[in-house]
Amino acid sequence: MGREEQEMDKLQYVMDLMHKHFGCSTNSDDYATESILLFRDELDVNLLPDFFDEIYTEKEVLVQYFAVEEYIAYIITDVEDQKWRILGVIEGPKLVYYQKFD
């Protein structure tokens, strides 16, 4: 699967989740997306589940952001294999939903 297909899979997954849990749009045009490579110490620990340090120990992470309405969803993946680790949803200054991937 190519990188563009992986990005579309992420967007579709996030759109479905946001619609199901928060009643958000399922139109991809309503979502702003961005990918960024960050060092772990650049992540805001207040916007991560408490157990994040237990499941992820790499120095760098790839974060894909999806903004829709008043929410920002993110997927944190491994840099090398792009395996999904955590999905979180932020509303204002707090984490309102998260999902762990094995």
Language-model segments: residues:
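Small/flexible residues
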Residues: 5, 85-87, 102
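Generic detector of bulky aromatic hydrophobic side chains
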Residues: 17, 92, 99-101
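Acidic, low-complexity, intrinsically disordered interaction modules
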Residues: 32-96
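N-terminal trafficking/processing presequences and adjacent post-cleavage segments
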Residues: 1-42
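Short acidic DE-rich linear segments
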Residues: 2-3, 96-102
